[in-house]
Amino acid sequence: MASELDNLPVITTRREEAQGFLQGLVSKGLGWARKYSLFQYPFVTACCGMEFMTVASARYDLDRFGAALPRFSPRQADLLIVVGTVNCKQAPILRRVYEQIAEPKWVVAFGVCASSGGFYDNYATVQGIDRIVPVDVYIPGCPPRPEQVLDGIMLLQQKIQGQQHKLIDRKPLPVVGQEPISR
């Protein structure tokens, strides 16, 4: 049962419209900038690491997608690439690395072992890293071909550009005279 208030037009001020327009432009600009400036932290644990190194070579050139140089501290990265099998003893380490990565952060599961445990179906292997950290893109293969990795990075870039990006998420300051300010 809808009330009469639901049918009334929404009235906005020019300032609210301008803020919405400006936020849209800022969001698109930040999406474009973040899309081409991925600071990766590779968490390499197994044989897929050899194929991962191939992607950075001159033939495939991951640098043209903005994800060239790996960071050696998770605090300097925004993209976690989990390469290979993760066992149960490594799971808390992976979780801690994920928590240390700067916001906004993205995760890529590289290879079938990181995606679903691979052919290691036993008590010591984590059956997919999505049980530990949220995953944005899965790259299949054992090991994945470099072309598949580039497709996965481009898919992640599309996802990043489509997200809503904000500069600062602050509460508005109270206006003097509206209500008393208590500290």
From Swiss-Prot:
GO terms for cellular component: plasma membrane; respiratory chain complex I. Binds 1 [4Fe-4S] cluster. It catalyses: a quinone + NADH + 5 H(+)(in) = a quinol + NAD(+) + 4 H(+)(out). Pfam families: Oxidored_q6 (PF01058). The keyword Translocase applies. It is found in: Cell inner membrane. GO terms for molecular function: 4 iron, 4 sulfur cluster binding; iron ion binding; NADH dehydrogenase (ubiquinone) activity; NADH:ubiquinone reductase (non-electrogenic) activity; quinone binding. Its cofactor is [4Fe-4S] cluster. It is an enzyme of class 7 (translocase). [4Fe-4S] cluster binds at C47, C48, C113, C142. It comes from the Bacteria. The keyword Transport applies. Keywords: 4Fe-4S, Cell inner membrane, Cell membrane, Iron, Iron-sulfur, Membrane, Metal-binding, NAD, Quinone, Translocase, Transport, Ubiquinone. Its EC number is 7.1.1.-. GO terms for biological process: aerobic respiration; electron transport coupled proton transport. Disulfide bonds: none annotated. It is a peripheral membrane protein. NDH-1 shuttles electrons from NADH, via FMN and iron-sulfur (Fe-S) centers, to quinones in the respiratory chain. The immediate electron acceptor for the enzyme in this species is believed to be ubiquinone. Couples the redox reaction to proton translocation (for every two electrons transferred, four hydrogen ions are translocated across the cytoplasmic membrane), and thus conserves the redox energy in a proton gradient. NDH-1 is composed of 14 different subunits. Subunits NuoB, C, D, E, F, and G constitute the peripheral sector of the complex. Belongs to the complex I 20 kDa subunit family. NCBIfam families: nuoB_fam (TIGR01957), PRK06411.1 (NF005012), PRK14817.1 (NF011392). This is NADH-quinone oxidoreductase subunit B 2. It comes from Anaeromyxobacter sp. (strain Fw109-5). The gene is nuoB2.
